[in-house]
């Protein structure tokens, strides 16, 4: 039987997912897959479809379709890759603008949710999230999937639990900011 804590965590996960999916976007970004792929192209510029496919956990055909939609919408451009057989993908100016807008909306929503906690509650939540994420990260591909929508700047600076686990490093401490 599910305990109350697990139930509440599931509800919070749905709240965050539903709010992210409800963010208005251009038609090409109507679904979470396209949004995740757009963000992955921004996080891993000049990467191949294969690298990005892993980051968003898609089959190769699904990744090709997602990229084609982003290219058609003028959000992503194809370039010649370092390996002439592969295509490198990068955000266009419009793609960068959309990625930034979606990231800002995500940041605001998460700040609103966490902002209802006092400092000591935030510290406890951060410690618990570090422990959960460090323990749940399975491998490098899973790490890319987990962090596919992250603003990785603040997390990497403090010691990202997902990145630490993926690299075989010890679980990081809570940041003391």
Give short role names for the model-derived ranges.
Residues 1-28, 175:
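N-terminal leader segment of winged-helix/HTH proteins
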Residues 68-123:
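Charged, amphipathic alpha-helical coiled-coil/dimerization segments
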Residues 16-23, 56, 98, 102-117, ...:
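Alpha-helical linker/hinge and terminal dimerization helices associated
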Residues 20-62, 143:
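N-terminal helix-turn-helix DNA-binding core of bacterial DNA-binding proteins
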Residues 5, 12, 32-34, 94, ...:
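N-terminal positioning helix adjacent to the helix-turn-helix/winged-helix DNA-binding module
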Residues 8-11, 15, 27-30, 42-48, ...:
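Hydrophobic/basic alpha-helical segments enriched in Actinobacteria
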Residues 123, 127-177:
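C-terminal regulatory/oligomerization modules of transcriptional regulators
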């Amino acid at each position: 039987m599910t305990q109350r804590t697990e139930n509440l965590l599931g509800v919070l996960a749905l709240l965050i997912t539903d709010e992210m999916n409800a963010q208005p976007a251009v038609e090409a970004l109507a679904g979470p897959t396209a949004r995740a792929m757009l963000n992955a192209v921004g996080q891993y510029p000049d990467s191949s479809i294969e690298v990005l496919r892993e980051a968003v956990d898609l089959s190769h055909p699904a990744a090709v379709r997602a990229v084609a939609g982003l290219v058609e919408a003028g959000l992503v451009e194809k370039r010649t890759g370092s390996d002439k057989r592969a295509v490198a993908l990068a955000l266009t100016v419009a793609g960068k603008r959309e990625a930034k807008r979606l990231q800002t909306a995500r940041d605001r929503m998460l700040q609103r949710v966490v902002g209802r906690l006092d400092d000591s509650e935030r510290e406890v939540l951060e410690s618990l999230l570090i422990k959960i994420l460090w323990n749940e990260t399975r491998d490098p591909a899973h790490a890319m999937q987990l962090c596919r929508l992250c603003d990785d700047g603040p997390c990497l600076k403090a010691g990202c639990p997902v990145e630490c686990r993926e690299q075989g490093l010890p679980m990081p401490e809570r940041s003391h900011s």
